Design a protein with these regions (language model features):
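Auxiliary, metal-adjacent structural segments of Zn-dependent hydrolase domains
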Residues: 100-173, 182-183
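An acidic- and aromatic-residue-enriched active-site/binding cleft used to recognize and process polar
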Residues: 150, 177-179, 206
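Active-site His/Glu-centered metal-binding helix of metallohydrolases
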Residues: 193-202
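Short, polar/charged, Gly/Pro-enriched helix-capping and turn/loop motifs at alpha-helix termini
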Residues: 103, 207-208
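N-terminal low-structure segments adjacent to metalloprotease catalytic domains
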Residues: 1-128, 132-133, 276-291
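A generic secondary-structure signal for well-formed alpha-helical elements
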Residues: 97-100, 201-205
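Short pre-active-site segment immediately N-terminal to the catalytic Zn-binding motif
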Residues: 175-194
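Metalloprotease/metallohydrolase-associated module, dominated by Zn2+-dependent proteases
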Residues: 2-4, 120-131, 152, 158-161, ...
Length: 291
């Protein structure tokens, strides 16, 4: 039950109670006592997202069991964590779900339907992985996530593609099939959520001294780290010239051994940026942080 519900239920009870007293006693002055409770209910209804966020951020709860099971089934990084860090991971994912907007495109016939929980979870899991070692629980300038039923065109990129980042509006767009494929087929598949949120991280959260200086000459090394060539990644995204920091983020979490072997300096910078060393599978956090 959401925290705001604990306020509205008693208020509704007392409002109904006073209306009932007024009705059965034929004395409608009693109905006036219901007015404050109705006003409180209306205020809580309008402010419920903010109330729920404030309460749960101070007392974070882990994901519901069915979502945690889905996470444990598919997320390799999560499976290897210590029990304490699994709990932290779960809480960060839950807070990310609560603190961001997930919606369908206006052109979708099912626009009014809610985005399925598993699709939202895939994005939240990528965010929790990236932010596990940091105090942040979301990306301040990016709080809108659009899930399209298939590949999509946009005014910026008219061809069909699977993911895109709109920095100006703080929106990240994904196609649902590619999002699910990347999550359920890891590490063989390229995970779009990790890629795009890695881009978000380095454009909003990371300090400049922790951002590696990658250039296109290092594509061959990135390919050797993952066995994913540039063409494969481009076909997954649906756009040419993938962002190198997004690709590096993906490979850092999925192929840490080869990453450290082939690009040790970049690996260390990423460890500093994320405050994580994925080579230490059970406890990758370098310096402990408060949630």
């Amino acid at each position: 039950m959401k925290p705001s519900t604990y306020i509205t239920v008693p208020c509704i009870f007392f409002a109904v109670l006073f209306f009932a007293i007024a009705f059965f006693n034929d004395n409608y002055a009693w109905a006036l006592y219901a007015v404050p409770f109705i006003i409180i209910c209306a205020g809580v209804f309008v402010m419920s997202p903010q109330i729920d966020w404030w309460v749960l951020k101070k007392n974070p709860q882990p994901l519901p069991t069915h979502l945690e099971n889905y996470l444990a089934q598919h997320q390799t990084y999560y499976k290897k964590l210590s029990p304490e860090l699994k709990t932290l991971y779960s809480k960060k994912a839950a807070l990310f779900l609560l603190g961001n907007n997930f919606f369908r495109p206006a052109s979708d016939e099912n626009e009014r339907a809610k985005v399925p929980e598993d699709l939202k979870l895939i994005i939240a899991v990528a965010a929790a992985q990236i932010l596990l070692g940091r105090e942040e629980v979301y990306f301040a300038k990016f709080d809108n996530y659009m899930i399209c039923p298939n590949t999509f065109p946009t005014p910026v990129y008219p061809s069909q593609h699977n993911s895109e980042l709109f920095a100006l509006d703080g929106v990240v767009i994904f196609s649902a099939p590619a999002l699910v494929h990347g999550f359920t087929q890891q590490p063989r598949a390229f995970q779009l959520a990790t890629y795009e949120l890695g881009r978000v991280f380095f454009s909003t959260v990371a300090s400049t001294e922790t951002i590696p200086n990658l250039d296109i000459s290092q594509w061959n090394v990135l390919e050797n780290i993952s066995s994913m060539n540039k063409n494969f990644i481009e076909s997954t995204i649906g756009l040419a010239n993938p962002d190198l920091m997004g690709v590096a983020t993906h490979h850092f979490f999925n192929f840490p051994q080869k990453f450290n072997q082939l690009l040790p300096d970049v690996f260390q910078l990423l460890c500093n940026a994320f405050n994580q060393n994925p080579l230490k599978e059970m406890n990758p956090i370098i310096a402990s942080q408060k949630l």
